[in-house]
Amino acid sequence: MSIDTVHVDLGARSYDVRIGQGLLARAGEEIVALAGPRRVAILTDETVAALHLPALRESLAGQGIEAPALALPAGEATKCWAELGRAVEWLLAQRIERKDLVIALGGGVIGDLAGFAAAILRRGVRFVQIPTTLLAQVDSSVGGKTGINSPQGKNLIGAFHQPALVLADIDVLTTLSPRDFRAGYGEVAKYGLLGDEGFFEWLEANAAGLASDPALRQRAVRHSVEMKAGIVQRDETEQGERALLNLGHTFGHALESATGYSDRLLHGEGVAIGCALAFELSAKMGLCSQEAPSRVAAHLAAMGMPARIADIPGDLPDDEALIGLMAQDKKVQDGRLRFVLAHGIGRAFVTDAVDPALLRQVLAQSR
């Protein structure tokens, strides 16, 4: 299969997202084309380093680039001040300057943290995203959102800092555990649910084959990236339309916070439950027929994904506490909760006109 290129047109901050097989092996060639950086430093995590760092270093060495690497602990808990500080001080020790390059090799956690480190290092250093999870390839590596978590909520500390290049090698996705692959699928399904019913129908027919069929996998990643790139081009800093990409995230982030950002609930699993809850709330409010949430829940179940709060193992805070966690969501304006709801599959919109009684009802019925 050929390599697909999706161009993200943001004027001086424009860049390409390259999608296909074998991109890790040709990363050196792709990176040298970026006006030849003098120094390159890699931020990754311990799990990804064991799987993919040797291939990346070999590719860079083939172009005469030596690249030191720092491997941080794997997992959402790494998106914190302590690990950010460690990464920044290490980059300074490597004497990375503005015209040099930071490579983020990993999933969404590493991409977010490395991008934020690059944003604040010397007031802005270029960086390249090499996403190694399905979630990162279709969502977090594209669009320039970088940051870390706070004990008060997810992604509350960060900056917009666009990458110089994204290399999405679909072959590396074969090293993911089935659970991690399914978690990433939560973000893929989100694109169909928020703005493209035809894509959701395609997923209903083909998603079961994504893990084993590289052609299907490449098509799903490309279409997801095309949808996100279009939205980012029209609303880079989330003043309006880009908020639609947060479908499922108001619920999902609260649930992630409630589980302590642990492996009890992966981000994509939280998004899946959040999408199901958003459609249930939409139906309860009379915005769409009950057929829509039933279809969403059925598809998530068919993919082996959680769709209810009851699917999360262990104890959780009560509904009032969950609503309190939602109040820390980035979309809150003037103290009012804002939700991405839907008039049907592929017809999402943002609103703060949500009946608290119906919200509590939806949460209670999901337990």
Curated annotation (Swiss-Prot):
Disulfide bonds: none
SUPFAM superfamilies in UniProt: Dehydroquinate synthase-like (SSF56796)
Compartment annotation: Cytoplasm
Keyword field contains Zinc: yes
InterPro entries assigned: Dehydroquinate_synthase, DHQ_synth_AroB, DHQ_synth_fam, DHQS/DOIS_N, DHQS_C
Assigned EC number: 4.2.3.4
Any one Gene Ontology BP term: chorismate biosynthetic process
Cofactor: Co(2+); Zn(2+); NAD(+)
GO cellular component: cytoplasm
Ligand binding (Zn(2+)): E187, H249, H267
Catalytic activity: 7-phospho-2-dehydro-3-deoxy-D-arabino-heptonate = 3-dehydroquinate + phosphate
Origin: domain of life: Bacteria
Keywords, alphabetical: Amino-acid biosynthesis, Aromatic amino acid biosynthesis, Cobalt, Cytoplasm, Lyase, Metal-binding, NAD, Nucleotide-binding, Zinc
EC main group: lyase
Cofactor comment text: Binds 1 divalent metal cation per subunit. Can use either Co(2+) or Zn(2+).
UniProt xrefs under NCBIfam families: aroB
Family: Belongs to the sugar phosphate cyclases superfamily. Dehydroquinate synthase family.
Family matches, as HAMAP family: DHQ_synthase
Function per UniProt: Catalyzes the conversion of 3-deoxy-D-arabino-heptulosonate 7-phosphate (DAHP) to dehydroquinate (DHQ).
Matching PANTHER family: 3-DEHYDROQUINATE SYNTHASE, 3-DEHYDROQUINATE SYNTHASE, CHLOROPLASTIC
Listed name of the protein: 3-dehydroquinate synthase
Species, as recorded: Paracoccus denitrificans (strain Pd 1222)
